[in-house]
């Protein structure tokens, strides 16, 4: 399945906000002006139609979590079948992805790096190696770095960065063991207010 491997800054500029696709605790640097669209001359973005706003919000969330369109639509369909708010269900499904949980626990400095750790069999769930980034982690699951991968420098650096930006409340991590417990799926109030999931629901409901 194809995946974008181009400049991360370009994606953030396209969405007009920092998507935190690059490692490090700081936001976009001065060379990546989020208010300008990608291109040699970086023209400022114009006003968008309602459809344009909905599309941009969907693209933004897709890129934050590193999910391709077909898979993202599948998450929406699953979210719509569940009880409660479709938008909140969608965000919870994305947050429960194994690659995202690895990122939230601080074992990877970005979701992309976390996805690579999972794909390279460096991560276990409840003691079993899982190499599927989209695997849905459940409340109470223990996610850990495999013993032979614990000495990787990038994991130590990622844990340090996570300590600087702060770890989310719905995971509990033992830094010495490089293992963590996924306590529960996050509530909507725990997630970024910069995401307007209702726009995505409106887009797919048409």
Curated annotation (Swiss-Prot):
Keyword field: Ribonucleoprotein, Ribosomal protein, RNA-binding, rRNA-binding
Any one GO MF annotation of this record: structural constituent of ribosome
Domain S4 RNA-binding span(s) in chain numbering: 96-156
UniProt cross-references to CDD domains, sorted A to Z: S4
An individual GO BP term: ribosomal small subunit biogenesis
Protein's UniProt keywords contain RNA-binding: yes
Alphabetical list of InterPro entries matching this protein: Ribosomal_uS4, Ribosomal_uS4_bac-type, Ribosomal_uS4_CS, Ribosomal_uS4_N, S4_RNA-bd, S4_RNA-bd_sf
Any single GO CC term annotated in Swiss-Prot or TrEMBL for this entry: small ribosomal subunit
Pfam families: Ribosomal_S4 (PF00163), S4 (PF01479)
Keyword rRNA-binding among UniProt keywords: yes
Function of the molecule: One of the primary rRNA binding proteins, it binds directly to 16S rRNA where it nucleates assembly of the body of the 30S subunit.
Subunit structure and binding partners: Part of the 30S ribosomal subunit. Contacts protein S5. The interaction surface between S4 and S5 is involved in control of translational fidelity.
Record family assignment: Belongs to the universal ribosomal protein uS4 family.
Protein name stated in the entry: Small ribosomal subunit protein uS4
